[in-house]
Regions:
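Mixed-charge, Lys/Arg-enriched low-complexity segments
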Residues: 2-13, 76-116
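Amphipathic alpha-helical segments
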Residues: 10-31
């Protein structure tokens, strides 16, 4: 989805991200909330959702920079990924890296119980 996506506006970008997450994670993801959305004075928004019925995840987009964190109360644990700038993003890779970062933190017995 790479270059040019930023010019679509934050509503279209946030919808594209939610769609990509739903397609990648299917029944392992739920409860999307898009908030703090604005185009002026600069584009930014956040998306909160539950992954594997285990973690609350927050995706933040701020002036082209983007990333995920695991929400723990008012704090978050940042999740590393290879695509910090949205203009160069491959949403498939972003989802795969999110999946790897989250699954490594969830007990294997829990994932096996749900056939994940």
């Amino acid at each position: 989805m790479g270059s040019g996506m930023k010019s679509k506006g934050v509503h279209q970008i946030s919808n594209n991200i939610v769609t990509a997450l739903k397609e990648y994670f299917n029944d392992r993801i739920e409860g999307f909330t898009i908030y703090n959305i604005t185009d002026i004075p600069y584009p930014m928004f956040s998306i909160r959702f539950t992954l594997y019925n285990y973690y609350k995840i927050v995706y933040n987009y701020d002036r082209g920079r983007n990333g995920f964190s695991i929400s723990i109360g008012r704090d978050g644990i940042g999740l590393k990924h290879s695509q910090p700038w949205f203009d160069d993003i491959d949403l498939g890779v972003l989802c795969k890296e999110l999946d790897e970062n989250v699954r490594i933190r969830i007990p294997d017995k829990y994932l096996a119980y749900y056939n994940w």
